[in-house]
Amino acid sequence: MTTLAIDIGGTKLAAALIDNNLRISQRRELPTPASKTPDALREALKALVEPLRAEARQVAIASTGIIQEGMLLALNPHNLGGLLHFPLIQTLETIAGLPTLAVNDAQAAAWAEYHALPDDIRDMVFITVSTGVGGGVVCDGKLLTGKGGLAGHLGHTLADPHGPVCGCGRVGCVEAIASGRGMAAAARDDLAGCDAKTLFIRAGEGHQQARHLVSQSAQVIARMIADVKATTDCQCVVIGGSVGLAEGYLEQVRAFLMQEPAPYHVALNAARYRHDAGLLGAALLAQGDTL
């Protein structure tokens, strides 16, 4: 059965047709509407989906935010702008005329990355470090989403009780410090206003403040992974996202993790599917894998 998979992110929308063998075809991308209004997103999704829907039998969505009873919610409402409470499933069912499933994008990516691991791995955690920090947890071969869709939102665990205020309302969340946005917000002096990509470039050039910001992010993620190991006893952790997959970053996380006591050590892998993980994970769920 061919699935029309859609990935809704903060900066881009992606869609593709995916068959039962996880072959991707006719992949398309559009920028996420800057206005972040319901009408703008509805029109963008219609333009994205229209050329593909005739060949599909179902729709699977991986989206930023929390999916609750078909509605789009978020721990950090500022991330969604005017899209809070957007009727995501109903909108796509109307546009495509097909049965529709929706799941958080990091949870979907976790499910895809889990299927790329050896069969003896039954417990794993996926962490994406990008504009924000998200995650997904697979326990005994089952994806955990939680009744309210909150499971795996690891970026909103505590890193520093005296740290910056997070958009979710807590103080010192992992996301507020270790994410691309958090790193950029902490940049000062000649780095003020730089995005995470620029910070990595400057760090590679030896800029001391940039190197500190990257190192601080990696250390915070490593400590979070130690907490995750203690909580889930996972067999491995897979790291993805634009920051997580940046050159040299995973090696720094691994080095900091090795400074933790041995019981908190866990194998770290780079994400295999990269920008297609959300699409593939959502398709897998729609094609018969259950939540």
Swiss-Prot record:
Give the superkingdom in one word.
Bacteria
Query: What is the uppermost EC class here?
Result: transferase
Gene Ontology MF: a single term? zinc ion binding
Give the residues the record marks as binding Zn(2+): H156, C166, C168, C173
EC number of this enzyme:
2.7.1.60
Q: What InterPro entries does the entry give? A: ATPase_NBD, ManNAc_kinase_bac, ROK, ROK_cs
> What is one Gene Ontology biological process annotated in the Swiss-Prot or TrEMBL record?
N-acetylneuraminate catabolic process
Quaternary arrangement and interactors, per the entry?
Homodimer.
Q: Which family does it belong to?
A: Belongs to the ROK (NagC/XylR) family. NanK subfamily.
Name of protein? N-acetylmannosamine kinase
Which species is this UniProt entry from? Salmonella paratyphi B (strain ATCC BAA-1250 / SPB7)
Q: What gene codes for this chain?
A: nanK
